[in-house]
A protein has these predicted regions:
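Short Gly/aromatic-enriched secondary-structure transition segments
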Residues: 90-94, 209-218, 272-281
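Soluble, non-membrane globular domain cores that form compact, hydrophobic packing
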Residues: 18-19, 136, 186, 282-285
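C-terminal or internal capping secondary-structure element at the end of a domain, subdomain, or sheet
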Residues: 382, 387-411
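Internal alpha/beta scaffold segment
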Residues: 265-291
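Non-catalytic, conformational "gating/processing" segments within enzyme and secreted inhibitor domains
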Residues: 101-266, 292-374
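Detector for small/aliphatic-rich hydrophobic stretches
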Residues: 2-7, 14-159, 170, 406, ...
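Short, basic/aromatic recognition patches
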Residues: 371-383
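Short glycine-rich loop/turn motifs
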Residues: 48, 245-248, 347, 385-390
Length: 411
């Protein structure tokens, strides 16, 4: 499989790069959720698998890699200006109950503040921004909500100038350590704003692979072809689970606050049977099950995956079509009407090698107005030498940061 990548929403420029990358943080042992925030976390994980499945179906023979967390931050920011049916649909896409609508901002803020502080040896950068058309008045309350809850920086730009596109792209490149060098191609004077989220992750394996143990081996692709790829190898103990559809091995980073869990379909099951088992409830059950470290003979392909997605049709199919039409209600953003989401662009990056994992994503959400609307025990062998799913997640609450499928390893 090839990988699909989800990712980043573009952020405001009023904060300097140094402010976003402030390292004088208090170290956290865990992120402690309230009961309401736990419900929202489970809801966002369900949204994560919904998004993954639709992207996977749309790119059925391709790799997929995406950051649902990034997309949820972008949707959370624009939802702060939504009302009526538009507000309802955005929340329902993220599985947020009506009674918890007011808690979504606090949930995101707790993660934006907490995720970078869980492990000093792992780099997690989260940045949000609002890029505003200098010709249009945006409501102060909308900007204040996103500044407070999403730490979003904001800057007014002349959307008629190509320099504005370059400025946004440079900001994204900086926040993603050059993993995402370009997120948008153009701007129009009819665009009201661009909301952006960026997430960058870099973690060293707790148990690294030896380069001398990496060799070319066969990978059995979904289309029945066989490809020679560089396969990393080690014999070590890792958390291991097995059920009727998957073998699951968890590979921790740093102090264990973050990990990558690889879900390898059982050889006697079809890919479709296994995908049908993947949802938020299953993820919660599997991750909460007690498990012992097992001695594994691990083979894992080196990866370098890059992709970009137009998310408008995906998000519309997930249940929020109203936001992409002139019927959308974004009266919380501006008095200027009609206003709607023109496009949502998502770019992602994944690199796996013997030492570390680097993952990044960017989501740019363009809001527009007045333009033409276009619809749209013994040693257990764990050989990831056939298509598999991978999830990069925080381990305390099992919050999903990135999720992907690998059909055809690329390096």
């Amino acid at each position: 499989m090839k990988s699909d990548f989800f990712c980043i929403i573009i952020g405001l420029l009023l904060f300097s790069c140094e402010q976003v990358e402030d390292v004088s943080r208090i170290q956290l042992d865990e992120i402690s959720f309230t009961q309401k925030e736990n419900v929202i976390n489970n809801s966002i994980n369900s949204f994560s698998f919904d998004l993954f499945h639709l992207l996977s179906n749309q790119n059925s023979t391709e790799n997929v890699f995406v950051s649902p967390f990034s997309v949820s931050c972008a949707l959370g920011m624009v939802n702060n200006g939504a009302s009526g049916i538009t507000h309802l649909e955005i929340r329902h896409v993220m599985h947020i109950p009506d009674s918890l609508a007011s808690s979504l901002n606090n949930y995101h803020l707790k993660l934006i503040d907490g995720l970078p502080c869980l492990d000093s040896s792992v780099t997690v950068k989260i940045a949000n921004s609002m890029w505003l058309n200098e010709e249009v008045l945006v409501k102060k309350q909308f900007k204040q909500k996103n500044t407070t809850a999403y730490k979003a920086v904001s800057q007014q730009l002349d959307f008629s100038k190509s320099e504005s596109v370059d400025k946004i792209n440079r900001w994204v490149s900086r926040q993603t350590e050059d993993c995402i060098p370009k997120i948008i191609s153009d701007l129009s004077p009819d665009n009201l704003m661009v909301l952006v989220n960026c997430i960058y992750f870099q973690g060293n394996w707790q148990s690294p692979f030896e380069k001398s143990d990496t060799h070319k081996e066969q990978f059995f692709c979904a289309d029945k072809t066989v490809k020679d790829v560089y396969m990393m190898h080690q014999l070590a103990s890792f958390p291991y689970r097995k059920n009727e559809c998957f073998e699951m091995a968890t590979f921790p980073y740093g102090n264990g606050s973050y990990a990558m869990t690889v879900l390898l379909p059982n050889v006697d099951k079809s890919w479709r049977e296994c995908m049908d088992m993947l949802d938020g409830n299953s993820w919660k059950t599997w991750m909460n099950d007690s498990t012992d470290n097992m001695l594994l003979d691990v083979k894992l392909p080196k990866l370098l995956l890059k992709n970009k997605y137009q998310m408008r049709e995906i998000l519309s199919a997930m249940g929020m079509p109203n936001a992409f039409t002139p019927r959308a209600d974004f009266t919380g953003i501006t008095e200027k009407m009609p206003v709607w989401i023109e496009e949502v662009i998502h770019a992602s990056y994944l690199e796996l090698n013997e030492k570390e994992t680097k993952a990044s994503a960017a989501t740019a959400l363009k809001v527009t107005f007045e333009s033409e609307w276009v619809p749209i025990e013994p040693v257990i062998p764990f050989y990831a030498n056939r298509p598999f799913v991978l999830v990069i997640h925080e381990t305390g609450n099992n919050t999903i940061l990135f999720i992907g499928k690998v059909f055809y390893p690329e390096k």
